[in-house]
Amino acid sequence: MQPYDIPTHGAEKRPAPGNGQLTQGIALNHLAIGYAVRQGSAHIVAQGLVAEAHPGQLTCLVGGNGVGKSTLLRTVAALQKPLKGCVSIDGQRTDVLSAAQRAQQVAVVLSATPQLPHTTIGRLVAMGRAPYTGFWGRLSEADHAACTEAMRQVGIEHLRHRLLDEVSDGERQKATIARALAQHTPAIVLDEPTAFLDYPSKAAVMALLRRLAVEGQRTVLLSTHDLGLALQLAHHLWVMTDGALVQGSPTQLAADGTLNRFIDSDLLSLDAASLTIQMKGVR
């Protein structure tokens, strides 16, 4: 079903490698994203998007402000419908799943940590079990074990009885990641999870997400403006610019000039050998 008549001009200038037909991981299949403005018409943010994110890898989505990163992640997470094409997770199209089924396929972490007064970290993490607990929300022994293991994996088990407003920003963000882990989904999507953290906390959270992807063989996809950290920690990059999406490893995208075109300015350049961003003319 294609409810919108989307023109083909302005599609991505350089298709990303891969055919978007993964049976494991996240696949974008000729995806168009945007918003319905009235019946039968839409505001198109980007279209013709083909990309893949693999289990056991940290995939980072980077791009300038306003290019549509959040819109893309919302579409991947099935928080809004695609205008055309589809998103698949482990071979299942997300747009044909029920809300309950989607909640068992993908967990979502947003940049703003939840504002939940009088809520403990343990209670927040337990919310990740909601897709499995039924109408009354009662936790079984298995649910409690899943929550404990999720908190252990991110290093906050000792904080389970602390209130959210009693811990640091980094600890709160780790709690939201633990909630996503407790949800037991094959994919986790995070929209700028380090946006409000100091630099050491940003690095710690990014390194944690990389480890969780590798050890749990999860597909972890996140957006970030911290390109320096993404270059050092991501296995795979999605670079979004001008309505197009290009994918590859940091090394590949540095070698073919994609990252230089994205980064290069009067002040900045990319050192492809070290995958570090350099300031020009600074002594």
Regions found by a protein language model. Name each.
Residues 62-64:
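The feature captures the beta-strand-to-loop junction immediately N-terminal to the Walker
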Residues 77:
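Helix-to-loop junction immediately C-terminal to a conserved catalytic motif
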Residues 85-93, 102:
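Conserved ABC transporter NBD signature motif
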Residues 126, 141-159:
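Conserved ABC ATPase "signature" region
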Residues 163-167:
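Conserved ABC ATPase signature
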Residues 188-191:
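Catalytic Walker B motif of ABC-type/P-loop ATPase nucleotide-binding domains
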Residues 263-283:
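ABC ATPase nucleotide-binding domains
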